[in-house]
Each structure stands twice: as C-alpha cells, then as structure tokens.
Amino acid sequence: MKILLSCLRFSPVWRGPRSAACVMQGGKLQRFQSYNTAEEGIEEDIQFAATNQESSSLLYPDHIPTNAVQKLLLSAGSAVMALYDPYRHDMVAVLGETTGAVALRKLRDQMRRDPEGLQILQERPRISTSTLDMQALREMQDGTLGREYARFLDVNRVTPDTRMPVKFVDDEELAYVAQRYREVHDLMHTLLGMPTNMLGEVVVKWFEAVQTGLPMCILGAAFGPLRLNNKRMQKLGVLVPWAVQSGRNARCVLNFHYENRWEQSVLSLRKEIGILPLPEIKA
C-alpha cells in the first residue's frame, strides 16, 4: 500500500518556525514526532498534505486532493491543535476545509440565489494587500467601512494576507466560497466591533456559526469560552445572545460585495445586513 500522507512543515508569516516529523510506512503511521522548547514557546505542527497527486487532478492552484481517510486524519489532527491553541490559524483553516463541505454547499447556494452574491461568485474578488489600496482606505472619512476596516487592521497589527489559501476543498467553486469567508472574517470583526483578543474571537465565532453552519465555527464558539476568565465570561454572557440574534437576523454576509462599499458608513451597512445594535457592557 502506497504512502497516504506525509507531513508538511509550515511557517506562516504570523508564526515563528516549527518543526515536525511524520513517518508512514506500509500505509501505517509509524511515528509522529514534534519538537517544542519552553524557551521558544513553539507549539508542535501537525500539518499534513497528500502525496503522489497528479497535476491534472488539481482543481485550483493550491489544491491538494485528499480522500475520505486522509480528510478524517486531517480533521482529527487539526481539531486537537485548534482546541489546544485557538490562535493556530493554520490548524483552524485546515479544520474548516476538511469538515465544511455541507455548509459550504449551502452557502454557495445562498450566494447563487442573491444578485450580489451571484456577482461575487462570477467575478471572484479577492481581499489582499495586492488588491486593496490601504492608504486610500486610511484616508477615507471616519465611520466609513473602508476607514474602520483599515483602522481595525492597523490597531490589531494584522493584514489581509495572513489568511491562508484554501487547499483541501475538492470543488473549485466551494474552495472560492471558503476563501471568501476567510477573507471577510476581519470585516466581520469590523462590523461587529470586536477586537482580535479571545473574547472578540469567540463572539465573532458565535455570529459566524449561526450564519454559516461551519463545524469549525461551531467548535470555536463552543470551546473558546473555556479560555476566558470570570470577568470576560460575564461580558460573554451579554455578547453571545446578541451575536446569535444578529446572526439569525442578518442576511448572508457573503452576499455583500464589500469592495464596492468602502465609502458606505458602517452604521448603514450594519442595518442593511441586519446586525443588531451592540449592547451596553459594564466595564
């Protein structure tokens, strides 16, 4: 039996270097070894990639074809690491791709039924530093989507380029839907008024879980609060019901061509989408 999987070592731009070794012989996993030093504070990598794929079977540039068994292994490994460290965006990304086929099809169908969503599927816009004029966004009027999005990125020291390309979705159109969801995630933070700390991420995940039905979002919403202290849990008790109600009330957030709405005010866009006013929270 041929080797099914081998480890890939990734060093995302937002993470330091890691190393891991995975050996499969005779179709069986012989050893998984990771190296983690307390001084460096590095978490072990369990990124996998399919081997022996034919170039003719690739559906898009970053595609890595996988079978059901490989997807199961990827899902299990990435779920463990994502729960251990929710800031492992690479693990969260793999988990979303390997478990989200049903949800992605539903999202794709919602986009097809909406004029603006259909336009997005046809035009395939991308959100990255190569497609955005960040300086122009920074110079927009306060309160506009463009200005507040740029402010969010600057304050939290992130860029649109930190979103990994989709690899494990075995359908070209669904892969774009997954990529679009990933690239508008920071816009959800902006529209919901949530920072990138653990509290903010959990609140956004509750909103996205209701909106998308992606297992990865549901998992993050359910287990993310375990890492919050008592004070933040009290705030979460107010914010989660609001996020859930907003998610149910809102139109599909993938049906908005945000690149054409930079000059629209955040307040008016929130109303158009159906996001409820942010509740007051005691300090």
UniProtKB/Swiss-Prot annotation:
Its EC number is 4.1.1.130. Zn(2+) binds at residues 185-186, 189, 201. Keywords: Lyase, Membrane, Metal-binding, Mitochondrion, Mitochondrion inner membrane, Ubiquinone biosynthesis, Zinc. InterPro entries: Coq4, Coq4_euk. It holds the Pfam family Coq4. Signal peptide: none annotated. One of its GO terms (molecular function) is 4-hydroxy-3-methoxy-5-polyprenylbenzoate decarboxylase activity. Pathway: Cofactor biosynthesis; ubiquinone biosynthesis. It catalyses: a 4-hydroxy-3-methoxy-5-(all-trans-polyprenyl)benzoate + H(+) = a 2-methoxy-6-(all-trans-polyprenyl)phenol + CO2. Its main location: mitochondrion. It comes from the Eukaryota. It is a peripheral membrane protein. GO terms for biological process: ubiquinone biosynthetic process. One of its GO terms (cellular component) is extrinsic component of mitochondrial inner membrane. The keyword Metal-binding applies. Belongs to the COQ4 family. Component of a multi-subunit COQ enzyme complex, composed of at least coq3, coq4, coq5, coq6, coq7 and coq9. Lyase that catalyzes the C1-decarboxylation of 4-hydroxy-3-methoxy-5-(all-trans-polyprenyl)benzoic acid into 2-methoxy-6-(all-trans-polyprenyl)phenol during ubiquinone biosynthesis. This is Ubiquinone biosynthesis protein COQ4 homolog, mitochondrial. It comes from Xenopus laevis (African clawed frog). The lineage of its organism: Eukaryota, Metazoa, Chordata, Craniata, Vertebrata. The gene is coq4.
